[in-house]
UniProtKB/Swiss-Prot annotation:
The lineage of its organism: Eukaryota, Viridiplantae, Streptophyta, Embryophyta, Tracheophyta. Probable transcription activator involved in leaf development. Binds to the DNA sequence 5'-CAAT[AT]ATTG-3'. CDD domains: homeodomain (cd00086). It comes from the Eukaryota. This is Homeobox-leucine zipper protein HAT5. It is found in: Nucleus. It holds the Pfam family HALZ.
Length: 272
C-alpha cells in the first residue's frame, strides 16, 4: 500500500474507528471523530446568522435542547397576535398562561413577543417617517409659495417707493421767483421820470410834487415862469435863501383899504 493513501478501516469497532493517511499514522481516533461530526450537525441545524423569519418561527435560543426547530401553527400565531394587540409587554404570569393555553413553552412565547415588538417598532418608524415626509413636502411647497409672494410684494414696495420719491422731488423744487413790490423794473422807473418831465415841460399850470430825489427840478423853477419879475423885499439874504421856493415871488401882498370890524387890515394876495 502506498504511503500517501487514505482509507477507512471498517473492521474496527464503532467506538474505535480510525482514519489512516500514508504510513498508517492515526489522524483522528475514537471520540474525536464523533465530536467533529456532532459539530457539523449542530452547524447545519442552526446557522450562525438567522433571518427574521427564522427568529419568528424559532422556539427559543437554547442550544442544549436536542429537538429540531418547531414552527407555530396558524391558530397559535392568531392567538398570539390578539394577545399582542391587547398588551405588547409580556409579564411572567401572562407568559405562563399563554404557554399553557397554546401548548408551547414559556420561552417560545417570550421569543415570539420579542420579535413581534421589534417588527412593530420598525413599522411604527416607517409610519412616522412617511408622516414626517408628507409634512415636510407640504411645508416645502408652502415655503416656495410664500417666497414667491414675498418677491412679488417686494417688487411692489420698490415700485411704490420710486413713485413716492419722484413726487417728493417734484414738491421740493423751488417755485418761480415772484418780484417783490419794492423791486421795481428800472425801465418802469425811467418811463415814470420821462412822463413827469413831459408834464412839466408842457407849460401847464399844474403843480408837481418835488422831493429830495429830484433836485434838478428845484433849481430850474425860474425857467418855467420866465415872465414873472422877482419882487424885492426887506428880508435878509440868508432868510431869502432858506425860504426860497418856486412860488415865493409869484404871490405879492397888496394892501386893501377895507378893514374888518375890529379895525385890523386884511392882506390880500394878488395874482399878476
Amino acid at each position: 500500500m502506498e504511503s500517501n493513501s487514505f482509507f477507512f478501516d471498517p473492521s474496527a469497532s464503532h467506538g474505535n474507528s480510525m482514519f489512516f493517511l500514508g504510513n498508517l499514522n492515526p489522524v483522528v481516533q475514537g471520540g474525536g471523530a464523533r465530536s467533529m461530526m456532532n459539530m457539523e450537525e449542530t452547524s447545519k441545524r442552526r446557522p450562525f446568522f438567522s433571518s427574521p423569519e427564522d427568529l419568528y418561527d424559532d422556539d427559543f435560543y437554547d442550544d442544549q435542547l436536542p429537538e429540531k426547530k418547531r414552527r407555530l401553527t396558524t391558530e397559535q400565531v392568531h392567538l398570539l397576535e390578539k394577545s399582542f394587540e391587547t398588551e405588547n409587554k409580556l409579564e411572567p404570569e401572562r407568559k405562563t398562561q399563554l404557554a399553557k393555553k397554546l401548548g408551547l413553552q414559556p420561552r417560545q412565547v417570550a421569543v415570539w413577543f420579542q420579535n413581534r415588538r421589534a417588527r412593530w417598532k420598525t413599522k411604527q418608524l416607517e409610519r412616522d417617517y412617511d408622516l414626517l415626509k408628507s409634512t415636510y413636502d407640504q411645508l416645502l411647497s408652502n415655503y416656495d409659495s410664500i417666497v414667491m409672494d414675498n418677491d412679488k410684494l417686494r417688487s411692489e414696495v420698490t415700485s411704490l417707493t420710486e413713485k413716492l420719491q419722484g413726487k417728493q422731488e417734484t414738491a421740493n423744487e423751488p417755485p418761480g421767483q415772484v418780484p417783490e413790490p419794492n423791486q421795481l423794473d428800472p425801465v418802469y422807473i425811467n418811463a415814470a421820470a420821462i412822463k413827469t418831465e413831459d408834464r412839466l415841460s408842457s407849460g401847464s399850470v399844474g403843480s408837481a410834487v418835488l422831493d429830495d430825489d429830484a433836485p434838478q427840478l428845484l433849481d430850474s423853477c425860474d425857467s418855467y415862469f420866465p415872465s414873472i419879475v422877482p419882487i424885492q423885499d426887506n428880508s435878509n439874504a440868508s432868510d431869502h435863501d432858506n425860504d426860497r421856493s418856486c412860488f415865493a415871488d409869484v404871490f405879492v401882498p397888496t394892501t386893501s383899504p377895507s378893514h374888518d370890524h375890529h379895525g385890523e387890515s386884511l392882506a390880500f394876495w394878488g395874482w399878476p
